[in-house]
Amino acid sequence: MQPVLELKGISKSFPGVKALSGAALRVYPGKVMALVGENGAGKSTMMKVLTGIYTRDTGTVHYLGKEVIFSGPRSSQEAGIGIIHQELNLIPQLTIAENIFLGREFVNKFGAIDWRKMYQEADRLLKKLNLSYSSHRLVAELSIGDQQMVEIAKVLSFKSKVIIMDEPTDALTDTETESLFRVIYELKSQRCGIVYISHRLREIFEICDDVTVFRDGQFIGEKSVKELKEETLIEMMVGRKLEDQYPRLNLPRGKKRLEVKQISGPGVTNASFSLYSGEILGISGLMGAGRTELMKIIYGALPKTQGQITLDGTPIVIRNPQDGLACGIVYISEDRKRDGLVLGMSIKDNMSLTALRYFSNRLGGLNHKEEQNAVSDFIKLFSIKTPSMGQVIGLLSGGNQQKVAIARGLMTRPKVLILDEPTRGVDVGAKKEIYQLINQFKKEGLSIILVSSEMPEVIGMSDRILVMCEGQISGEFFAEQATQEILMAAAVGKQYGAIQE
């Protein structure tokens, strides 16, 4: 089969950095090509070279059998190569149709906008994607998943032959992800070639036909998904074996640190559990099971309607996150961009934001030297890749942003660290580094709650595992007992005997 798009021998250098060296990518009609690699592997640079944002130093781009040079995103878009970015580019106050045809409105013979034709064409595009809602709806009324469908319709309005999806499920629920996959199958049936950029290996094995792997700006290989195992793909991405991807430490646990008795609140009913010093307690369950809600109740971000929380044997009252921090409970959000980090601020300011009281002098001012020393120590300890602590955090990779978020929590010297989806959107190499940091905290006696949708991660890192279903704890297991089948059964409400304390 001839590729609809082929990039060969692509090289691109910036001052002091070789971003791409002999990189290659082929996209076939009616097939999904995954493009994978660690953060910094060159995936984004390759897409910018393809669409003309960057000029390539060497190499060729062939599209529909002809060599092409695009002058920028508009020329590649008009040629039929569309990109759906991780950050959606829609105007909430406009309708779906207005967003799809913004700057390309249909005009009648009198020079006025032909609204009827525009809405008819927008409705036709939505129908092509098997979407039932009207193009008269405002984008602001749509979920993130539906907004992404509008982006796909917008790309199709250019009669795109190739569609590039950059981390398309990053902000989607499980249901929205299923809807996206249905649309991808529909696009395949229409002979569209799709480039699927993702860190989520499970999705790659579910939706993609072939995989292209980049490492350090170089093309490592192209394989059929059917020929690959997950371990082999990870080895190709990181250049080393990852047999010890989950380096769990088997250490004796300490004294009881936290006890939660009959807690209820938004999305949670009668939850009870204990947590010990030097222990990692995994929390598993399906989307909407109440895992995040339970953690936010404990931390004070959601109201508790009944129950008691005891810390080191003393009952505590937590009305808000400030109370939680004061008691020594830190919550690292699953959505670091919305709840965790201020992307326009520096690494230093983000890291020390909740711990400024530790750097204040007797006059109430800040001891900047102490603050800088502490931030510098954490940057070294966490191996955060940055030119300086003054770097704007929004420019860091997802893995390095997550390390800063965790470091900020540790700066407050907590007793309990709650990590909600700590490796979401993080590449496999950075995941391993985060696991090693979690083990270091465990060695030091910190009590850790690890909330994760990735069952291998929960089983691989936890000492004990709680499973939630419909707001209740439906199972409790030692890690040695746990399998993905057992956890899934508990997650859908099938009863397994909980372990005894």
UniProtKB/Swiss-Prot annotation:
Its main location: membrane. It is a peripheral membrane protein. SUPFAM superfamilies: P-loop containing nucleoside triphosphate hydrolases (SSF52540). InterPro entries: AAA+_ATPase, ABC_carbohydrate_import_ATPase, ABC_transporter-like_ATP-bd, ABC_transporter-like_CS, P-loop_NTPase. It is an enzyme of class 7 (translocase). ATP binds at G37, E38, N39, G40, A41, G42, K43, S44. GO terms for cellular component: plasma membrane. GO terms for molecular function: ABC-type D-ribose transporter activity; ATP binding; ATP hydrolysis activity. The keyword Translocase applies. It holds the Pfam family ABC_tran. Residues 5-241, 249-495 form the ABC transporter domain. Its EC number is 7.5.2.7. Belongs to the ABC transporter superfamily. Ribose importer (TC 3.A.1.2.1) family. The complex is composed of an ATP-binding protein (RbsA), two transmembrane proteins (RbsC) and a solute-binding protein (RbsB). NCBIfam families: PRK10762.1. Part of the ABC transporter complex RbsABC involved in ribose import. Responsible for energy coupling to the transport system. PANTHER family: CARBOHYDRATE TRANSPORT ATP-BINDING PROTEIN MG119-RELATED, D-ALLOSE IMPORT ATP-BINDING PROTEIN ALSA-RELATED. This is Ribose import ATP-binding protein RbsA. The gene is rbsA.
